Design a protein with these regions (language model features):
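PLP-dependent class I/II
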Residues: 1-141
Length: 141
């Protein structure tokens, strides 16, 4: 934070505005993309974070577990897109973000976090990737 002490308030304000504008556009495009390919996914609209929370509870078969799905995507999940290349999507399951009593349903079980920490051209593939990976996973489960 010491380096920021030498920056003017106006320069910091301009930098923050640039960041907001950059992410605002990306958030809008990705949100619309997720809703277009999977209208029944519950998709957050981030305000202060650089990730989406996507809940698949309305479309997942009973017993869906985000940890197992995220692991499957990392280890086995690969889908081809129109360019002929195979891709996967790395996500963070949200099971561990909630506390509760043993035996209670964990709302994070069907929730996944998709980060914006990727180049925008690849990030634009996320809605189609998640849809295809989710459908492939559910078909084999």
């Amino acid at each position: 934070f010491g380096a920021l002490a030498h920056e003017s308030h106006a320069d910091l304000h301009n930098w923050y505005e640039q960041q907001r504008d950059y992410y605002r556009k990306m958030i809008f495009e990705l949100y619309e993309g997720f809703k277009e390919v999977e209208p029944d996914f519950i998709v957050s609209r981030p305000e202060a974070s650089i990730y989406f929370v996507i809940d698949v509870r309305k479309v997942a078969k009973p017993g869906f577990d985000g940890v197992e799905f995220a692991s499957w995507c990392a280890e086995h999940g690969a889908v081809s897109l129109d360019d002929g290349k195979e891709y996967t999507l790395l996500m963070a399951p949200l099971n561990g973000f909630y506390s509760g009593k043993k035996g209670e349903d964990n709302p994070g079980r069907t929730q996944l976090r998709v980060s914006f920490c990727e180049n925008p051209d690849l990030l634009r593939l996320a809605p189609e990737l998640l849809s295809k990976l989710f459908r492939a996973y559910e078909a084999q489960r």
